[in-house]
């Protein structure tokens, strides 16, 4: 849990730039931290759920309604498309299926989902790429390599 907390605190340090109080964000963070403290199951997916919900709160969440089987996810525009975009920031069809699956995960059901180490590493890298595309000045996350060591 300590490594996970370090990773999430680095993310929050880079993402949260609010100068005004944000009760929705505070409530989300408070409840998430409490859940992490109390949880003994599903820890391997906690950071994925946390990051995707944080995107939702920031208004930069992927548009799931545009998904059709066989489509690719255009990370620049945040939508699923039927053709590979003309830029390099997209998820292929297989990665897009994993994203759709991920977007259905919640803190309540996260322990029911399992991912291979390869999928887990790929997904976290792609989520962080999405953050870099949509949040100004979002840097490389230094604690990511430590976090990924948990997957071994």
Give short role names for the model-derived ranges.
Residues 1-152:
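Non-catalytic alpha-helical scaffolds and adjoining flexible linkers that form interface surfaces
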């Amino acid at each position: 849990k300590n490594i996970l907390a370090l990773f999430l605190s680095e993310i929050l340090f880079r993402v949260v730039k609010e100068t005004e109080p944000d009760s929705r964000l505070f409530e989300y963070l408070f409840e998430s931290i409490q859940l992490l403290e109390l949880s003994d199951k599903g820890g391997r997916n906690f950071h994925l759920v946390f990051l995707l919900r944080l995107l939702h709160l920031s208004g930069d969440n992927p548009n799931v309604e545009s998904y059709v089987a066989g489509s690719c996810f255009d990370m620049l525009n945040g939508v699923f498309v039927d053709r590979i975009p003309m830029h390099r920031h997209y998820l292929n069809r297989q990665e897009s299926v994993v994203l759709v699956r991920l977007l259905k995960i919640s803190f309540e059901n996260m322990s029911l989902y399992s991912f291979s180490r390869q999928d887990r590493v790929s997904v976290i890298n792609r989520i962080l790429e999405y953050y870099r595309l949509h949040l100004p000045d979002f840097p490389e996350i230094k604690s990511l390599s430590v976090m990924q060591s948990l997957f071994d």
